[in-house]
Amino acid sequence: MSRIKVENLEQEIRSMIAEIAERDEEEIKDDLNFVEDLGFDSMMALEMLAKLEKKYRIRIPEEELSMLNNLQQTVDLVKNLLSAKE
């Protein structure tokens, strides 16, 4: 994964989550729970999943979905999946 992608990855995903949650990017902290703190429902989670898979050309395995509870976990998973593609 290129250095530029790594540096921008967190900001890109933060922006994506803010758009889905209809919040300002500054409100999306690394450890805020998507469901409890940001009000995500199943449709919002599916929207995030679809956007992540399309933007980064990755496939997030079903067993990994339960690990996507906050920004930091999501960034870490996407980094790992991108690294595995190289």
Where are these regions (language model features)?
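Thiotemplate assembly-line natural product biosynthesis machinery
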Residues: 2-26, 78-86
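Short coil/turn motifs that cap or connect alpha-helices
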Residues: 24, 59-61
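Two-component histidine kinase catalytic core, primarily the HATPase_c
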Residues: 44
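Glycine-centered, phosphate/nucleic-acid-interacting loop/turn motifs that mediate DNA/RNA or nucleotide
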Residues: 56
